[in-house]
Amino acid sequence: MISAKDYHIEMLSVGAADAFILYVIDKQNNEHLILIDAGNYKDGDKIINHIRKYYNNPVIDLAIVTHCDDDHYGGFVRMLEKLSNGDRDAITIRQFWVNDPGKNHIDVNDVKYVNSRPVVNNRAREIYNCRDLNLLELIDSLRIPRTEKFAESINN
């Protein structure tokens, strides 16, 4: 847990989508940038430009995907695509909090015409497809740590 000396919250202009920046300065004067959702795919560039313009250290310490609607995670797909391609204006993301719907949250017996855990897992993860990319696959290919923080709500 970060002990904050100062912080501010920004709600970014991404149309009907969602994207929030939580910027924290801890008691040792270290800066922490948390991005909560990232709007649609096209909003990824807008968010990168905003962070580069207004923040000294263009690194996202924590990226949080609140749920798997593309107007919440699509911008992350764009940002990771740029990072994967080695684009000069790409921004490093150090960690993700994102649920993986393929991580045994679905009972195979509840899915018609499927009787294999790997098939169910792969189909469930397709919910994060955007353009010809998949958010979870991009995160993993870039070796960015990802943690499930909202998993309890799935089973309740």
Put a short name on every predicted segment.
Residues 60-71:
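Metallo-beta-lactamase
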Residues 47-50, 75-79:
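A short acidic, amphipathic alpha-helical/loop segment
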Residues 42-46, 71-74, 106:
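Residues that form or flank phosphate/diphosphate-binding pockets in enzymes
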Residues 32-33, 59-62, 91-95:
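Residue-level recognition of the N-termini of beta-strands and the immediately preceding loop/turn
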Residues 1-8, 77-156:
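Flexible, acidic/histidine-containing loops and adjacent segments that form or flank the divalent-metal
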Residues 2-59:
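Conserved beta-strand hairpin/beta-sheet module of binuclear metal-dependent hydrolase folds
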Residues 36-41, 68, 100-101:
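Active-site metal-binding loops of divalent metal-dependent hydrolases
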